[in-house]
Amino acid sequence: MLGFTYSFSVWRGDVDPVFPYISAAGDNRPEACMFSMFLNICSFLSMLIVYLRYSLVAELNRSSDLLLKSFNRLNLYAGLLGASGMFLVANFQETAVIQVHLFGAFLCFGSGCVYMLGQAWISYRMYPLFSGIRIAKIRGVMAIASVCLFFMAFGFGWAAANTFHSVFPDLPTPRPWTHKLVPMPATICTVSQR
């Protein structure tokens, strides 16, 4: 779905085709309308998938493991919180309200990392009856990589903004960061979460 927005943004020359800054693809009209619509659909589908996974684990567990039952419910909240962050990113474009947009992105990716770690733990906990050790290990590796990349993206973005503002204190942070490798960790983090 979002590939359409990306393709349209590249065709119009609004983003760099190699390393696009994700929010820049949905910042100008008409891309902003398509970006919001498709990301809202993705957010709804993410909520649905999170709830279906919660229901599956709850049904397979059927109160036989109370710790797993409680943790599954907490992980449901983390997943729904991440999808809600995606709604914020979709509906508050970067140039409109940057604080809400960045909060939504942080919520989306941060809660997504927590959700992935939780799913990895649930898979380990459900082994050997309902989950294979291979899928549990794959989920664990992907979750740890996602957390590392999330902190790298956050850290490098913060450092880049501080460095820029130490030299140019009166200028706003330049956006979008196209034709630079700054959004690369965020892109890797996004890909690793799917």
Where on the chain are the PLM-derived regions?
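Early transmembrane alpha-helices of polytopic membrane proteins
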Residues: 1-58, 71-85, 91-94, 103-124, ...
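Membrane-interface helix-boundary motifs at transmembrane edges
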Residues: 58-71, 97, 127-135
